[in-house]
Design a protein with these regions (language model features):
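Conserved C-terminal alpha-helical bundle
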Residues: 1-41, 59, 63-65, 100-104
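GST superfamily/GST-like fold recognition
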Residues: 2-6, 43-71, 76-81
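Short leucine-rich amphipathic alpha-helices used at interfaces
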Residues: 14, 21, 66-67, 109-111, ...
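Residue-level signal for nonpolar/aromatic packing positions in well-ordered secondary structure
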Residues: 34, 52, 82-88
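Residue-level signal for well-ordered alpha-helical positions
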Residues: 65, 94-95
Length: 119
């Protein structure tokens, strides 16, 4: 669901309000579930696991999903805990050198990402 949110909010060649609203609200619903789970757990599976690593990668671009961690205090605590772990921190530094958030893809990137010609 969060990938669809990214697509319709950031990448879609035409802005479709229904799709933007639908997936933004779905992202909000998922963040609420995550916040509830983390209200009495330090990590998603009680101990740090691949579930945390995988979910972290989807929470990181939250602005593209129309979400603010201030609205989800348990997710914010969890996110802040995960991002300073040595391997995560090292990975983020590699990404910061190679990735631009919200950059509009050119024709070649569009083809690679969506396997379709840009309109």
């Amino acid at each position: 669901m969060l990938g669809q949110t990214h697509h319709f909010r950031t990448y879609a060649p035409e802005k479709i309000e229904y799709a933007i609203n639908r997936y933004t609200k779905e992202a909000e619903r998922l963040y609420k579930i995550l916040d509830n789970r983390l209200s009495d757990h330090d990590f998603l599976a009680d101990e740090y696991s691949i579930a945390d690593i995988a979910t972290f990668t989807w929470v990181r671009p939250r602005k593209m999903q129309g979400q603010n961690l201030d609205d989800y205090p348990n997710v914010k605590r969890w996110y802040d805990t995960i991002k300073v772990r040595p391997a995560i921190s090292e990975g983020l530094s590699v990404l910061s050198d190679n990735m631009k958030w919200n950059a509009k893809p050119g024709s070649k990137e569009w083809e690679n990402m969506f396997s379709a010609s840009k309109k």
